[in-house]
Amino acid sequence: MYETPLTGLVLSGGGARAAYQVGVLRAIARLRRERLGPRRARLKSPFGIIVGTSAGAINAAALACHADRFDASVEVLSRVWQDFRAEQVYRADSLGVIRSGAQWLTMLSVGWLIARWRKARPRSLLDNGPLAELLNTMVPLERLPMMLQQRQLHALAVTASSYTGGEHVTFSWEVPAGTAA
């Protein structure tokens, strides 16, 4: 059991909401600096438990992976959302659209005949490789176990939904059992 109560942060989905969330987080960071002083406020996140869904899950995971540097993580999120463009999510250039279109056309015209195409069919209309690159930069998941082990963070949960199947899946991480306080 924890001696002091934990504060949780729940971040909902939606791109516009995720950008709004970062504005609120910036205000929280500013208020902490005013109250605690700039040196102490830059440290550990005020949120011991962070939960997010969809675009809010991206913000949640980024905050969790940098739970030891709250101000810095908020600034990273702020820079991403202030300059956010469609090109950061999918390739909309001519070559990217042609390549993706060719994959779909091949799969739809003859792919059903070839077993390898049935298994390796395109997953999206446009190439979302840029989003994967952005997430790898924003969310260094290799830091998450350390944040939990050091108790910079007590738990993270992110929820994802399938557009095609409609199912929801929640992934969660928490402080390992038996970890000293």
Predicted regions and their residues:
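Active-site gating loop/helix substructures
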Residues: 132, 149-181
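Residue-level detector of functional hotspots within protein domains
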Residues: 10, 36, 43, 142-144, ...
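Surface cap/lid and interfacial helix-loop subdomains adjacent to catalytic sites
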Residues: 124-155
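Patatin-like phospholipase
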Residues: 2-8, 16-129, 133-135, 172-181
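Glycine-rich, flexible loop/turn motifs
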Residues: 104, 121-122, 140, 165-167
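Short polar catalytic/cofactor-binding loops
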Residues: 12-16, 164
